[in-house]
Amino acid sequence: MTQFPKDLRQWLGDNCVISLPTLITESIAPDGKTRKILVEMSDQSRVEAVLMEQHYGYSVCVSSQVGCAMGCVFCASTQGGLYRDLTVAEIIGQVVIFGALTKEEIHSVVVMGAGEPLQNYDNVLQA
């Protein structure tokens, strides 16, 4: 970050925390084109995200909430109910982890993991 003035770098270091969710597990499909990760947030809540290799590049499916309040009978995310919304940083963190794992550019992001994105609209929109 040497492009920023020294006093700004000092202020950022003193006042800002930059952290990613912790990678817990990674599963890779037999064809190598799909990866699923389980990540843990700073409060020990966990969500899954998926990376899919498409003909146009990499697409990431992220979660927007821990759990879900919608009650859809076909979805496992709703079984424990809604725990909380993910923050903007936690949503972005899922994408950043895949970028680091693949060393490739992520071409698209789909918000369709755990949770109902419209119930966390502001954070999803900012992410």
Q: What is each model feature region?
A:
Residues 1-58:
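Flexible, acidic/Gly-rich N-terminal and inter-domain linker regions that tether
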Residues 55-66, 70-127:
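Conserved Radical SAM active-site core
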